[in-house]
From Swiss-Prot:
UniProt-listed Pfam families: KH_2, Ribosomal_S3_C
Gene name of this polypeptide: rpsC
A Gene Ontology biological process term: translation
Function as written in the Swiss-Prot or TrEMBL entry: Binds the lower part of the 30S subunit head. Binds mRNA in the 70S ribosome, positioning it for translation.
Protein name, UniProt field: Small ribosomal subunit protein uS3
Keyword Acetylation attached: no
Family: Belongs to the universal ribosomal protein uS3 family.
Protein species of origin: Mycolicibacterium smegmatis (strain ATCC 700084 / mc(2)155) (Mycobacterium smegmatis)
Keyword presence, Nucleotidyltransferase: no
Keyword vocabulary terms for this entry: Ribonucleoprotein, Ribosomal protein, RNA-binding, rRNA-binding
KH type-2 domain segment(s): 38-106
Miscellaneous notes: Binds 2-aminothiazole antibiotics, which are antitubercular agents.
Cross-referenced CDD domains: KH-II_30S_S3 (cd02412)
């Protein structure tokens, strides 16, 4: 069901893409194990960097690693020393040449992984879990591309002896709709009472060939103008924008005009006969 499965895996090939792009026959299991080791290496040493996603692409003799982070300065380090260290560790792990790309995340409040990591950090600092969840929801809903969010915490909440799960939701989060763009993030908070799992679902609208989202985001100048049924525009009188027949005075003036015209036409022949 859509409520239980990972939203990324549920929508692979529909609205989401694979985070590891390579092909192998006999070395498939080795590459999968290596990808897990690469992501674990980047997650353990760069907790403060705010890594949202890691994409891996392989060729015959090269491995390309794209790191999407909210704080690229921490990953790069002073004069690139941290990036060089990470590249050396990855080359030692894979035994191949590594191309490291560090990409900045523009809106970290709308990335589910970063939101989950932020809530987990607050729980580790003894912040009340309800306050942390509501603060994350409020900051995410301020983003224009976020239409709904759900945050769930599971574990010994508040130091209780029995573990439980609580979640808060705002907006729409259609987990069973395949065309829905759902971003999912998971992070664990280490507290004195044990680990608390934080899950975040963010709904960013539907993807139907990209037509609906592009039409909504198009500026007003690019949208087609609606033509009027008649070629001429109605005449307006005054600065208030009223037409000639929209007021009592205007209707009276228009009704008196034909009568005055007929009276003038009737008087004209009479004057000519008298002369």
């Amino acid at each position: 069901m859509g409520q239980k499965i990972n939203p990324h895996g549920f929508r692979l090939g529909i609205t989401t893409e694979w985070k590891s792009r390579w092909y192998a026959d006999k070395q498939y299991k080795d590459y999968v194990k290596e990808d897990v080791a690469i992501r674990k290496l980047l997650a353990t040493g760069l907790e403060r960097a705010g890594i949202a996603d890691v994409e891996i692409e392989r060729t015959r003799d090269r491995v390309r690693v794209d790191i999407h982070t909210a704080r690229p300065g921490i990953v790069i380090g002073r004069r690139g020393t941290e990036a060089d260290r990470i590249r050396a560790d990855l080359e030692k792990l894979t035994g191949k040449q590594v191309q490291l790309n560090i990409l900045e995340v523009k809106n970290p409040e709308s990335q589910a992984q970063l939101v989950a990591q932020g809530v987990a950090e607050q729980l580790s600092n003894r912040v009340a879990f309800r306050r942390a969840m509501r603060k994350a929801i409020q900051s995410a809903m301020r983003q224009p591309n976020v239409k709904g969010i759900r945050v769930q915490c599971s574990g010994r909440l508040g130091g209780a002896e029995m573990s439980r799960s609580e979640f808060y939701r705002e907006g729409r989060v259609p987990l069973h709709t395949l065309r829905a763009d759902i971003d999912y993030g998971l992070y664990e908070a280490k507290t004195t009472f044990g680990r608390i799992g934080v899950k975040v679902w963010i709904y960013k609208g539907d993807i139907v060939g990209g037509k609906r989202e592009l039409a909504a985001a198009a500026p007003a100048s690019d949208r087609p103008r609606r033509e009027r049924p008649s070629g001429t525009r109605p005449r307006r009188s005054g600065s208030a924008g009223t037409t000639a027949t929209s007021t009592e005075a205007g209707r009276a003036a228009t009704s008196d005009a034909p009568a005055a015209g007929t009276a003038a036409a009737a008087e004209a022949p009479a004057e000519s006969t008298e002369s």
